[in-house]
Amino acid sequence: MVSNLESSIQNLTSAEYNCLADLNLYDSPECSRLATQAAAGRHLWVSDNFQDASVEVYLCEDDYPGWVSLSDVGLLQKATLPYRASRLSEADIKKLLPGAIAFTHQAMQQSNYYLWGGTVGPNYDCSGLMQAAFVSVGIWLPRDAYQQEAFTQAIAMAELEPGDLIFFGTPAKATHVGLYLGDGCYIHSSGKDKGRNGIGIDRLTETGDEVSRSYYQQLRGAGRVVKSYEPQGRK
């Protein structure tokens, strides 16, 4: 007798699917390290690259690749309508920023810890929190910090306004991102190493506490979200 899971695997084809529940995506076919997460309702494209225990997929909203365990394919349902991105003007986005900021404050009030690959509450990584906050008001950002930096409109630090993104890392690449709140403060999800192991508010200063100083030393610059990400249809 064929189980529901076995039936789901047998019927899985290269096509667009909806996530029926929150779903983990991994960075390799072994599914040993989390790459990102897909909230219930998201669209993903199942490729024809099947391995023994997983299949390669691409999230439709942000073109992000990953691997889904075949044990989770029962959480997928073939999409009846393809994903279509909404176009937003810069003025539209500006009106929505207070909602994105409010999302981060609400997330901080929940018990949470830093989770590499986390984009579904309560536990996030840095860029996952940014993506989730903006998606909560209908704005899509790319997934990773360096992608978000390239996607935003670069601005001088003196031009910072609440809702802008602040990037940290090495001279070569952005590896961390936070959301500017105003008055020299930003909110972010930081790890255990010189961070807060979760969501917290820090200051852009070299004279603050240890966490603020550590990130300020890695400051790269800032960017303004002026559009919503439109997928390139990667398959």
Q: What is each PLM-predicted segment?
A:
Residues 1-14, 45, 58-107, 112:
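Boundary regions of SH3-family modules and the immediately adjacent low-complexity/disordered segments
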Residues 32-50:
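Conserved beta-strand/loop element in small beta-rich adapter and peptidoglycan-binding domains
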Residues 46, 57-58, 176-181:
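Short beta-strand-centered aromatic/proline hotspots
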Residues 51-56:
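Short aromatic-glycine-enriched beta-strand elements
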Residues 141-207:
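...with weaker cross-activation on analogous glycine-rich loops/strands in unrelated enzymes
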Residues 4-6, 12-27, 35, 85, ...:
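Aromatic- and glycine-rich peptidoglycan recognition patches
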Residues 19-29, 143-150:
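Short, structured beta-strand/loop micro-motifs enriched in basic residues and often containing a Trp
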Residues 112-162:
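Catalytic cysteine-centered active-site loop
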